[in-house]
Amino acid sequence: MRPLRAHRPALAVAGLVLGLALGTPALAPAQNNYEIQVYGSETVAPKTTMVELHSNTAVEGTRHTTDGVLRTQGAFHETLEITQGWTSWFETGFYTFTSVQPDPRYEWVGNHIRPRVRAPEDWHLPVGLSLSVEAGYQPRRFSTDTWTLEVRPIIDKQWGPWYVSVNPTLDRSLKGENSGKGFEFSPAVKVGYDLTSTVSVGLEYYGALGPIDNFDRPRDQQHQLFPVIDLNLGPKWEFNFGIGFGLTPSTDRIIVKMILGYRFDWGSGPAK
């Protein structure tokens, strides 16, 4: 992470982002199984654009249309994520979600926007710390909630070959079946270990527990574990592959996911 010359702008943006999130009226998990990722605290560098392709498919998932939402088993989900770094502490991500149904049909599934800020290095915190807010729309046939909001604190730390990241995410439905439930707790955690300078292995956990003031019954909660592999193909590349296993009846049983990313640099110079 690069040092920040002025702290007040970062604090102001973080406060504004969090304030907007907490002040927005009464979320179901936003875009389940389209972007399956535990975030690290680092933001994209200024004058850099990160392009990522998230590819996911449920090998064993829902087999029928349920509550008006299309089946997940056999559907191939493709998400294009483009993230632009503006300063050493601020980035904005844009998402386009698509799905290829078993018919086959290629369908647009929605768009999201995600601003994110992070604590600068010269704060000398013992952990990496950042905050993202993601909002967007998805058609009713893909989600019981059409407008959603996600507030994601990100805390991570590297100890030698070990890496841990915790995302205690809060989701909120702005319009749809769950709009009256308030914030719901959807934690994500990653533990990784560097086998070599090129290969890392790890375990990722994703959950959806329900409203923060009244968790769902255990069988209605969603819990997934993904053994994953990350490849360090160079400073411009990102690669992640995993196979996920659902642990409850409400979770897709087997999901395969892959993330492939590349950074485009548009110039160099100090961030302002």
Where are these regions (language model features)?
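Bacterial N-terminal signal peptides
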Residues: 12-25
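Transmembrane beta-barrel domains of Gram-negative outer membranes and organellar outer membranes
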Residues: 29-272
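N-terminal secretory signal peptides that target proteins for export/translocation
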Residues: 1-7
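Short linear motifs centered on Gly/Pro in flexible linkers and helix caps
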Residues: 3, 28-29
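Generic short amphipathic/hydrophobic targeting helices enriched at N-termini
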Residues: 9, 13, 32-34
